[in-house]
Amino acid sequence: MLKIENLCKSFRTEDVETIALNNVSFTVEDGEFVAIMGPSGCGKSTLLNILGLLDNPTSGKYFLGNHEVANLKEKERTDVRKGEIGFVFQSFNLIDELNVEENIELPLTYLNISKAERKAKVQAIMKRMAISHRAKHFPHQLSGGQQQRVAIARAVVFGPKLILADEPTGNLDSKNGAEVMHLLTELNHEGTTIVMVTHNEHDAKIAHRTIRLFDGQIVETEGNQL
């Protein structure tokens, strides 16, 4: 379970304070698929960065499972990210110098598992994502849809409990976007919790719930919590 309580985030530059999140509270149950929507600048990406332990809130609490994680030390935050959270980005964020196989294997290198086990996990997820034939290709040799498949494979290869997806179909045409959403839905049906930021109303309807932000506050929640 993921739970945030009265989460606030502000940024100060010289004498100007910008409030990105203002007393945001919600719970995401295990196995739930939640979409977060709102206009540009409403705090969606800031919220996702905090959920992914890439940033700290100014105040408020964040529980991941039974642990309060908002104010962990950096090493502890890194350990949680490596073991429990998978990230999928709009711009894919693949490493240009690594081929498909190496990109997918990267998060496994931080875990205490053998090379043989790493290879087996990579082969299995490439087969599932239908990209085995691209194993030795580099990102620039792939289409946008193929790059996002690689990014999803990298995000899930170590079996995270939570996937955070930031506009996962934003750079894709409708066909490839639909395929990516199908993959995320399959993962969710298997029990993976997903929180997805999106501007796409069609993508949001696939989620169990949609949380709408405006000026850093929740203004509406649609759908039913699991």
Q: Model features per residue range: what roles?
A:
Residues 2-210:
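ABC family nucleotide-binding domain
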Residues 210-223:
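H-loop (His-switch) and adjacent beta-strand-loop-beta switch element
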